[in-house]
Regions:
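Surface/interface-facing alpha-helical segments and adjacent flexible terminal/loop regions used
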Residues: 1-160
Length: 160
């Protein structure tokens, strides 16, 4: 009996391998979607660190929103995946040469930005308000500058 308890404690502290694999797969799917060349070439999303972050925030928030309808297991997978996503952001900043002292501040800023974006997207989708979603995408993904075309509208239509 004690052996089972110890395993349960370690599983709760460190998570299971299956949980990690599921989160890895979901993050890979979100990342693949956010990196599709069509967003940058055809929809005018800036192919920059900020543009890539914004598409990760958009597609991550859509995936996590869908998982929110799946009860506790969905919430756990969403949190595990979000944790991995921010760990990947941390790694990316380090690979770009951001010093150890600057990483926590930048990741905290990214976290706040993600929360704001996810809340704006979720509110618009819950309300069924395509115009509000398009406005949030224009404000966040395109930094308020309309691309030459209908990229924000097309992204909003997909997200609805």
């Amino acid at each position: 009996m004690a052996r089972k308890t110890v395993r349960a404690i370690f599983a709760s502290l460190f998570g299971s391998n299956e949980r990690r694999r599921r989160a890895d797969r979901l993050l890979a799917a979100v990342t693949a979607q956010a990196r599709r060349p069509v967003f940058y070439a055809d929809l005018g999303v800036p192919d920059t660190l900020d543009g890539r972050f914004d598409l990760m925030a958009l597609y991550g928030s859509l995936a996590f929103r869908a998982l929110g309808t799946k009860g506790a297991e969905g919430a756990i997978l969403a949190q595990d995946t979000l944790d991995l996503m921010f760990s990947a952001f941390d790694d990316a900043l380090r690979s770009l040469g951001v010093g150890d002292n600057g990483i926590p501040r930048r990741v905290k800023t990214m976290g706040k930005a993600y929360i704001g974006r996810a809340a704006a997207y979720d509110a618009a989708i819950r309300a069924g308000d395509g115009a509000a979603l398009e406005d949030a995408i224009l404000r966040n993904v395109y930094r308020g500058t309309a691309p030459g075309g209908d990229g924000a509208r097309r992204l909003a239509r997909f997200a609805m």
